[in-house]
Amino acid sequence: MAGLKGLLFGGILFAMCGGLSEGQKKKEMVLSDKVGQLMDWASKRPVIRMNGDKFRRFIKSPPRNYSVVVMFTALQAHRQCVVCKQADEEYQILANSWRYSSAFTNRIFFAVVDFDEGSDVFQMLNMNSAPTFINFPPKGKPKKGDTYELQVRGFAAEQLARWVADRTDVNIRVIRPPNYAGPLMLGLLLAVIGGLVYLRRSNLDFLNNKTGWALAALCFVLAMTSGQMWNHIRGPPYAHKNPHTNQVNYIHGSSQAQFVAETHIVLLFNGAVTLGMVLLHEAATSDLDVGKRKIMCIAGITLVVIFFSWLLSVFRSKYHGYPYSFLMT
């Protein structure tokens, strides 16, 4: 009797092990098919286009031993999403840099879901804005850090690469296609300057023109203090359109980020305040008649008061709790 029980127990154990083995083999086959299909798509196009069915099969459904970075966007012309197109260009640069690097493996894939091709995915994730970047790890659900902070970090390929490295430990060296516009513009500028110097070679007094140098220095200072360098490094969007109200925001609500339009606004305000100060100085020191000096003084005061008030209001909107204001809140 004891021998019969042992034989029965052994049979059950063998059947269970066989079942587990078959299940494991099936799981490995499914995983192998998924990875093989993704590798095939990635070899043809570094950014894999996905609809709802592909998203559920290759990203939401187990098994998975790879990460997938997905850009949720709206690239169709009737959506009028300028930021989506700009972000897509940077995303393509990042994906191409990974695809054609010597370190390319099946650890990570890059995909895109367009709203017009996968609106059900947007509904599944309760997503109501685009573009949005999310990293789907090999195991578990995406955490808070797996959603890219676009408004803070911008969509430059280099910033996306740092975020990918932080979330997946995959380091991507971004390689941009050659851009000859910069060197051509620099060469044209040098040619124009060289031509002017050659034509005026008999009289180079214009190089000592204080007004010209002052204007050049002023333009440089206004550009730098308005945040142009930050834009160059981070690549932020020009503005943000609320998908619910269609209201366009030109000023970012956080002190940690800005829009390109915001830079232009601040540059205009700073320039107007500077012009007002120049007019006040000229009104006090010039030899013009009293009437013209009064007009210059009034214009200078008006420019300083109005545009400095607007500048402070912009500052207050970004740094919540800032106690000071002037005329405008």
From Swiss-Prot:
- Report the pathway entry: Protein modification; protein glycosylation
Residue runs in coiled coils: none
Domain of life the protein comes from: Eukaryota
| Cytoplasmic-side positions | 200-212, 280-294
Transmembrane regions listed in the UniProt entry = 179-199, 213-233, 259-279, 295-315
List cystine links: 81-84
**How does this protein sit in the membrane?**
Multi-pass membrane protein
Q: Where in the numbering of this chain does the Thioredoxin domain appear?
A: 41-169
Entry-linked CDD domains: TRX_family
What UniProt keywords apply to this chain's record, in alphabetical order? Cell membrane, Disulfide bond, Endoplasmic reticulum, Glycoprotein, Magnesium, Membrane, Signal, Transmembrane, Transmembrane helix, Transport
In this UniProt entry, which residues form the Extracellular topological domain(s)? 24-178, 234-258, 316-329
Compartments, as annotated in UniProt: Cell membrane; Endoplasmic reticulum; Endoplasmic reticulum membrane
| Gene Ontology cellular-component annotations | oligosaccharyltransferase complex; plasma membrane
Q: Where is the secretion signal located?
A: 1-23
Sites carrying sugar chains: 65
* GO annotation terms (biological process): protein N-linked glycosylation via asparagine
Pfam name, any one: OST3_OST6
Q: What does this protein do?
A: Accessory component of the STT3B-containing form of the N-oligosaccharyl transferase (OST) complex which catalyzes the transfer of a high mannose oligosaccharide from a lipid-linked oligosaccharide donor to an asparagine residue within an Asn-X-Ser/Thr consensus motif in nascent polypeptide chains. May be involved in substrate-specific N-glycosylation involving acceptor sites that are near cysteine residues. Could indirectly play a role in Mg(2+) transport in epithelial cells.
Subunit-level organization: Accessory component of the STT3B-containing form of the oligosaccharyltransferase (OST) complex.
Give the protein family: Belongs to the OST3/OST6 family.
Q: What is this protein called?
A: Dolichyl-diphosphooligosaccharide--protein glycosyltransferase subunit MAGT1
List the source organism: Xenopus laevis (African clawed frog)
